[in-house]
Amino acid sequence: MPCVWITGASSGIGAACACRYAAQGARLVLTSSSQERLEGVAAQCRAQGAAEVVVLLFDFRDLSGIDALARRAWEAFGGLDIVFLNAGVSQRTTVEDTSLEMVREMMEINYFAPVAIAKALLAPMVARGGGHIAVTTSIAGRFGFPLRCGYSSSKFALYGFFETLQAEYYDRGIRVTLVCPGRVRTNISFYALDKGGQRHGKMDPGQGGGMSPEDAARIIVHAISRSRREVLVGRKELLMVYIKRFFPGLCARLARRIRPV
């Protein structure tokens, strides 16, 4: 059974994927900044059949210890088969109301953290014969989305880095899956950064009516097992990805009409 490390594992997509891998008998390393919620997910995974579960707490707003975190995750079971870099934070502010500090925080958590982990694990993965890195991007990383300027920027950046990584390391046994969710019913909007850096504190209507995390996890875990380069996760909102590709002008007009909160 695979050894799997999931960041952002205390709720939503990360927790649902952890439970799905647990049902396969996987060995799991789970990371989040919330000890209580993470321990709850770990207990659920053990009950659902995980061979072993290790919990590693980490706050991705401070990356000074991230190399040590990656080393601990790797050493937990003597190597990792799958790394799912899922931790992230969103926002609900206009460009004018988004401070540079807020943008930097989102870039640290959403972009630099997964980049740093991937870089730390590349050499041991290659030496071991390969491995699989999945990373959560977003539909907001495929086109500009109102009230998401910093969030969209961080997710656009993930595409550039991880597509490059795949091109460079494919022949050395590294596989990359870009996980692109649309509206999934998680707490991402509740914990999103609002004006002044405070929590948004409520579920967006679109988010609340989105796909369940369990359905999303089923799609994601299957895509990783098939080494899919990219997997779109959601419902009709994913049409915007294809509209952007084939009708960019129409996509821009539709984006201006989106009311995300």
Task: Describe each model-derived feature in a short phrase.
Residues 48-63:
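Rossmann-fold cofactor-recognition segment
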Residues 118, 154:
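Active-site helix of classical SDR
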Residues 94-95, 99-104:
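Substrate-binding pocket helix/loop in short-chain dehydrogenase/reductase
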Residues 138:
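Residue(s) in the substrate-gating loop at a strand-loop-helix junction
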Residues 171-235:
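SDR active-site lid
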Residues 24-41:
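Conserved glycine-rich Rossmann-like NAD(P)H-binding loop of the short-chain dehydrogenase/reductase
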